[in-house]
Amino acid sequence: MELSVLGQNNGGQHSAGGCSSSSCGSTHDQLSHLPENIRAKVQNHPCYSEEAHHYFARMHVAVAPACNIQCHYCNRKYDCANESRPGVVSEVLTPEQAVKKVKAVAAAIPQMSVLGIAGPGDPLANPKRTLDTFRMLSEQAPDMKLCVSTNGLALPECVEELAKHNIDHVTITINCVDPEIGAKIYPDLLEQQAHPRRQGRKILIEQQQKGLEMLVARGILVKVNSVMIPGVNDEHLKEVSKIVKAKGAFLHNVMPLIAEPEHGTFYGVMGQRSPEPEELQDLQDACAGDMNMMRHCRQCRADAVGMLGEDRGDEFTLDKIESMEIDYEAAMVKRAAIHAAIKEELDEKAAKKERLAGLSVASVQNGTSGRYRPVLMAVATSGGGLINQHFGHATEFLVYEASPSGVRFIGHRRVDQYCVGNDTCGEKESALAGSIRALKGCEAVLCSKIGFEPWSDLETAGIQPNGEHAMEPIEEAVMAVYREMIESGRLENDGALLQAKA
């Protein structure tokens, strides 16, 4: 790597906003190790806490159409309703329209906790529109968490203004710390056209690192997003993870490249492949030794509304919100009560989880650590951290790994909905086949209900359906199924068996 300065860690000094050890985490039990002020920032942010995303909603407002970089994986669209990816919106809003929309959504979806600006261009390439929106929201919706996502090119010049408007979560997309690798990702840096291209990419990297340091110094939590591009930066992202951790980033989100040809991106048109789920997990696991990882990202649209994994944007188009009467003072009272109830539920769940964790893991280990191999299981859930969705109604499955050490969240797999009504349920063979392909590597799928045909096809594919744990907490259900697998003798490691026989 040429820019050795990027690897410096300021003597190992981090502000309270940074994650300086691998014990920093995004799941509920890991949050308990954080300082109280940091935990308060994270516990109801669905992007910064894996636990929170089961309970809290978010929305993005599309006030930033322009961008200062052209990335090979991006093709912005401003009037698109049928694609689910970053850089895509149905309508671009003025700051005033955005504020009204936020208040309308917050009143209708009281569990919404976060408002973000993430495009469809770069928010900081549209500083007036972005900062005007934040200024009005901090005045008119003071109970809302505010966050912004940026490529970082204009970040250092905006840090003071962001801090002034109470933005305490910032995401920076950092795909490399080496200009040679950047040359394969960024063909043009539009604000740096006076510079040679290689010099422009070097400036981008320097600006990203400088902005990260400035944010951390001000106690602003930073999440780093990185797009995993096989054959381009996949191995290099391990170095990126080490560097951003050393500089105090709180969370690293390694996302898979989206490269469908119909999206019109350079990579999509040129046939650059996306990573397989197993490749993504391997890279995330490799980075996890140096950095706390986000694994529940849905790569949302720039106008997403609702819980992660759902989009209710059609309910809040400009023509619909124009006629809405919004009493935001009353909405804040209702929102505060609902948020308090969710926090109480999460606290009770965390206490119960702590009591049960030692027992459940001990009952699996029982002095046989290493004897039983880990297992991937898919889960159908509609939220609340429960097994509460019919297999045929799922548009995604959450994937968990169970092992003698416990249960950990791995990621999610998107699928086409198999069952869309009584007349078509069971007739969508292609959707079922796609679901089975998406669940490759999983040995069980937990759901509230499942029909005979998908049950049979899943078993044939070596995936065991399980509907016995409906409405149970996900991690408890996954561990229960894992114990059942152990008791059936399915999970003995070959090496452990040979050693036992010897």
Curated annotation (Swiss-Prot):
Its EC number is 4.-.-.-. Residues 1-21 are annotated as: Disordered. S-adenosyl-L-methionine binds at Y73, G121, T173. Its cofactor is [4Fe-4S] cluster. Pathway: Cofactor biosynthesis; Fe-Mo cofactor biosynthesis. Residues 53-301 form the Radical SAM core domain. [4Fe-4S] cluster 1 binds at C67, C71, C74. GO terms for biological process: molybdopterin cofactor biosynthetic process; nitrogen fixation. InterPro entries: Aldolase_TIM, Di-Nase_FeMo-co_biosynth, DiNase_FeMo-co_biosyn_sf, Elp3/MiaA/NifB-like_rSAM, MoaA_NifB_PqqE_Fe-S-bd_CS, Nase_CF_NifB, NifB_C, rSAM. This is FeMo cofactor biosynthesis protein NifB.
